[in-house]
Amino acid sequence: MLKKYLFLTKPGILFGNFITTLGGFFLAAQGHVDFLLLILTLLGTTFVVASGCVVNNVIDQDIDQKMERTQNRALVKKTVSPSTALIFAFILGIIGFGILWFWVNPYSFSFAIIGFVVYVGFYSLWTKRTSIHQTIIGSISGASPPVIGYTAVTHQFDVAALLIFLAYGLWQMPHSWAIAIYRFDDYKNAGIPILPVARSVYRTKVECLIYIVLFAAVLNGLYCFGYTNVFFLLTFNVLTAYWLYLSIIGFKAENDQLWAKRLFLFSVILITLLSLSFSFTYQSPAPNLPLF
């Protein structure tokens, strides 16, 4: 019984957002971690993301039954009713937003609201089904957790918060498109107008390359503005250079699905290492460059 509800929350997505929230928190903490605040921030963010994922499951029932990788989900198999799932999502959301509002701060709460509304409203209900730009919209929600973690410590939105918001958003593009190429038939059968399906795999490869370069340029800004140290500069650029290399060899790939799987898996490794590295690649004291 509990397993069904756990999988409604999409554990893989929860883990990914847990790691990126941790990364934002570490960057802001500069080695001085308030562990109670960290636990509360992680719990609040995880419950909010879980709530959004459950609602997404309810919205995507018709799509999920057409895709091989999702056709065994509880709502598709009708082992959990939509009304029960929505009640579950509501409880998760109340807990998550409550933690962020009462025990973290209004900045983290606000970015949780932004991420939730974009994911459920603008992405799941609208652009996922209608627009080639769905991935850009969805990236806003994906970029919110590291900012939640960062602002939990700083109580302000500064240049570093802007840079990590942009960078994590840019990372989402090749990451998501790689999944779509790897699962091309699933997305095509479900009628989802994601870039590889709506345009072409070749165009997707070109745009993956562009977004990886933009991702690198933005994150290097953390060093340029004085938020990270030289070790970050070197290791981050080595990792990103390899990701760029994987993107480039995709143009000569004999099997697009295998290449896309490789690109996707490395994107996960990259963002995980990047997020965890903020625990020791920060520059202290960090500059005070508030935006609001």
UniProtKB/Swiss-Prot annotation:
InterPro entries per record: Protohaem_IX_farnesylTrfase, UbiA_prenyltransferase, UbiA_prenylTrfase_CS, UbiA_sf
Any Pfam family hit: UbiA
GO MF annotation terms: protoheme IX farnesyltransferase activity
Keywords: Cell inner membrane, Cell membrane, Heme biosynthesis, Membrane, Transferase, Transmembrane, Transmembrane helix
EC class: transferase
Swiss-Prot/TrEMBL catalytic activity: heme b + (2E,6E)-farnesyl diphosphate + H2O = Fe(II)-heme o + diphosphate
Listed pathway(s): Porphyrin-containing compound metabolism; heme O biosynthesis; heme O from protoheme: step 1/1
GO terms classed as biological process: heme O biosynthetic process
PROSITE patterns: UBIA
Transmembrane spans: 13-33, 35-55, 84-104, 106-126, 135-155, 161-181, 206-226, 231-251, 263-283
Family: Belongs to the UbiA prenyltransferase family. Protoheme IX farnesyltransferase subfamily.
Protein's job: Converts heme B (protoheme IX) to heme O by substitution of the vinyl group on carbon 2 of heme B porphyrin ring with a hydroxyethyl farnesyl side group.
The name this protein goes by in its record: Protoheme IX farnesyltransferase
Organism from which the protein derives: Acinetobacter baylyi (strain ATCC 33305 / BD413 / ADP1)
Lineage start: Bacteria, Pseudomonadati, Pseudomonadota, Gammaproteobacteria, Moraxellales
